[in-house]
Amino acid sequence: MTESFMGAGAPADASEAVVLGAALATVYGDRHPQASGAPAAIRSASRRLARFAGNYDFDIDAPFATWLRHIADGGDVNTARADAEGNRRRITSAIGAIVDRGAMPVLLGGDDSVAEPFVAGWRDHSPVTVVHVDAHLDFRDAVGGESHGYSSPMRRASEMSWVRRIIHVGQRGVGSARPADVQDSIDAGNTIVRARELVSVGAEAVAGRLVPGERFVIVYDVDGTDPADIPAVRAPVPGGPGAALLGDLFAALAARGSLEGLVVTEFEPELDPKGTSALALARLICR
């Protein structure tokens, strides 16, 4: 790691949130892990924002990044394309260590397969709800015989005893989900808030799906955002919520429940030549 998120220092006992990077977890076959450079790109973009810490932020009507001294950056989890099982184990261990200390992990992926071991980090703790922001459902049992790839993390999360339920948000268009996958998620007690509903009713109404004080984590696949705002993704789907609306949603969720962690996935720096998607993501994380 050559840069830290927002210039944050190394983790200390007093750190309230710790940023980690994970380039990949479980890659499908011989596909190129195009999101592997995302942690470095997001960190680099965040440094453009760090110089404004303390300045007025029009989106929150308050000074920007007053929390900066409370966060740390723990670098990247070691991952290797040929060691999917080891990748998942190391990511879960790193997240669990942060949760054990009472801090909040913020994981910068990486493709969406890192979401499964991220959620697994709460296995020794009180149950959490997963708020899954994504254009796709990610509820396939397996694709090509692989049950831990990026089409399956929410299916695997739903099988974890410490996951209370999943609130899917932002789904639209057509992807890998089949009718049976949608029904399976509903039958498991999960909720689907389609993109059109979020845009129609707004952030506060969707955040109201949480019980006040409910412990939750956010799994944010970047293609959940409309590609007009953040185009640098593998599977863009038009018609989604804009970055501003998602920022409002994240803030509303945090105000209503107890945010325990955040993972950001599926951003592909190779598709972001001007760095605007990375900057938008760094900004969303700061919300």
Predicted regions and their residues:
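Conserved alpha-helical scaffold segments that buttress catalytic/binding sites
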Residues: 1-287
